[in-house]
Amino acid sequence: MTMSTFKRIAVTNRSLCSASLKEQVEKICKAGLCNALILREKDLAEQDYMSLAMSIKLICDKHRIDFFCNNMPSVAEKLKCNLQLSYQSFLDQKWKSGQITWVSVHTVEEAINAERLGADGLIAGHIFVTDCKKGLAPRGLEFLKEVCTAVSIPVFAIGGIDDSNSDAVRLAGAQGECRMSWYMRY
């Protein structure tokens, strides 16, 4: 796998931004720092999320960045955009969006099952120590290798990824990496 095919995925968290989220997304998209963006604003009610998603999707579309709604299938359906779901939310889904759906997994068994049930890609983590999962031991590169070997769909690593360990993630077989803090503080 060449560096050009390795996906860089921004995961939002507006509480980490010094500017507005829209300004931050514009900045990272314009700079060409990511190939995809997951709007992960867990504290928003659906209507507020929808409003934010519409404006963030416009920015992503302008810069040809793949846009994913996080755990908001009805918003993804209305906006006709990609969807990223937790494993449990994916299991609970009664319909397939028709859009690209990535699923977060934390075990090899979840990865295999998500692929069997139609996931288009997996987000595996957390791989390294991260402030987002304080007190939880990271699953590590061996876990990532096992997931990548067990499935045939793309696997993207998440959790504590930075410039010092990005190559290790790629060499473990991941087809991309997700970063939150790095993008939100860029």
Language-model features and meaning:
Residues 50-69, 90, 95-107, 135-160:
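Alpha-helix-loop-beta-strand connector modules within alpha/beta enzyme cores
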Residues 28, 67-82, 106-118, 148-157, ...:
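Catalytic cores of alpha/beta
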Residues 4-22, 100-105:
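Active-site mouth loops of central-metabolism enzymes
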Residues 27-39, 75:
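Catalytic domains of carbohydrate-active enzymes, especially glycoside hydrolases
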Residues 10-14, 42, 85-95, 123-135, ...:
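Glycine-rich phosphate-binding active-site loops on the catalytic face of alpha/beta enzymes
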Residues 4-8, 33-35, 63-65, 79-81, ...:
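Short, well-ordered coil/turn segments that N-cap beta-strands
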Residues 2-5, 183-185:
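N-terminal ligand-binding/catalytic initiation module
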